[in-house]
Swiss-Prot record:
<comment type="similarity">
    <text>Belongs to the UPF0301 (AlgH) family.</text>
</comment>
<dbReference type="Pfam" id="PF02622">
    <property type="entry name" value="DUF179"/>
</dbReference>
<protein>
    <recommendedName>
        <fullName>UPF0301 protein RC0043</fullName>
    </recommendedName>
</protein>
<dbReference type="GO" id="GO:0005829">
    <property type="term" value="C:cytosol"/>
</dbReference>
<dbReference type="InterPro" id="IPR003774">
    <property type="entry name" value="AlgH-like"/>
</dbReference>
Length: 189
């Protein structure tokens, strides 16, 4: 048996396979892959809307110029470190980036972006996501081999679509998959 070839999925989207992941946080999830190396992987679920927050009060923005609440949706990025918040956003905003993917997406995690969004000076598109998803070395590869995930190229339209409930179905449609006809008896040839 030879060594397995590593395929870096950073900047790709994972689509939960229909009928395989049937409950919990990963059921019908879409995950944008922030980092994928032989040491493990990190991603953000971007279709789990949990609430709306006022940026001004959430980030304790002390500015009298903002007199009304600035409500933004808040998404659950995964089961790890819910106290950490990230903005997955379009690359038109490039101040103090945490990650820049060179595919029209970036990630920020600082107070400055929240203030800029509150003042209307932030990125054209953004999602505020708390928590993240992480895999140990080899864990994601094992999940891919057992067909828990489909992989698709990054698609900003899916990430920033207005209706989070339809994102997963639209991703399947983009991949040419009809959920009704997708077999739960899948495997590798």
């Amino acid at each position: 048996m030879g060594d397995k070839i590593f395929h870096n999925l950073s900047g790709k989207t994972l689509v939960a396979t229909p009928h395989v992941i049937t409950k919990g946080i990963y059921h019908k999830s879409l995950i944008y892959m922030l980092s994928h190396t032989e040491e493990g992987a990190i991603g953000l679920i971007f279709n789990r809307l949990v609430n709306h927050i006022d940026l001004k009060s959430f980030f304790k923005i002390k500015n009298d110029e903002i007199t009304t609440p600035v409500m933004v949706p808040i998404y659950l990025g995964g089961p790890v470190e819910h106290e950490k918040g990230f903005f997955l956003h379009s690359s038109d905003y490039n101040k103090n980036l945490l990650l820049d993917f060179h595919n029209d997406l970036a990630v920020s995690s600082n107070l400055e972006i929240s203030e800029d969004i509150a003042f209307g000076k932030g990125p054209k598109n953004s999602l505020f996501i708390v928590g993240y998803t992480a895999w140990k070395p080899g864990q994601l590869e094992e999940e891919l081999e057992t067909n828990l995930w489909l992989v698709m190229d990054c698609n900003k339209e899916f990430i920033f679509a207005d209706n989070p409930e339809s994102k997963w179905h639209n991703a399947l449609k983009h991949l040419g998959i009809d959920e009704i006809h997708f077999s739960s008896q899948i495997g590798n040839a």
